Amino acid sequence: MKESILDVLLYLFEHYFSEDADLVRDRDSLQNGLIQAGFSPAEISKAFDWLDALAEQRPSVARPHVDGPVRIYHGPELDKLDVDCRGFLLFLEQHRILDADQRELVLDRAMALDQDELDLDDLKWVVLMVLFNQPGAEAAYAWMETQMFLDEPEPVH
C-alpha cells in the first residue's frame, strides 16, 4: 500500500491534473480512483486537505516580480529541506521562475507534507504543483515541467 501524501499528490498530478486541466472531476470519483490504485483513505484525505490549502492561498491575479531579501531558513525548514533543496529554491527565485510569494507557498506546502525530509526530486514536484495552481505562471510551469522530464536541464534565459 502506498502511504505518503506526496505519493497521492503525484499520482493525482500525473493521472488526472496534467492530462486535462479543464476536465473537472468530483472528489468522490477521484477518491474512488485513488483507493483502487492502492492508497489508504487517510492519506487520500490528507492529500485533499493539502490541495485545499494550496487552492486557498492562490492569488486571484499574477503579481509582478520584485527583488527582495534573501530568505533565511529556520529550525524545521532546515531539518526538512537539505542544502540542495534550499539552493534550488534560491536558483528558482534568482532566475524569476518563482517570486517571493510563490517561494513561501512552496515552503508552506513542502512543510505540510508528512515527511521528515524532502529530497530535491520531491521538492521539484511541490514546485511544479504550486506553479500549476498559480495564475500567470504558465511559462514558469512549462520551464519547470521541462526540467522534470529532461535528462539534461534546459538553461534559463
From Swiss-Prot:
Belongs to the Smg family. InterPro entries: Smg (IPR007456). It comes from Xanthomonas campestris pv. campestris (strain ATCC 33913 / DSM 3586 / NCPPB 528 / LMG 568 / P 25). NCBIfam families: PRK03430.1. The gene is smg. This is Protein Smg homolog.
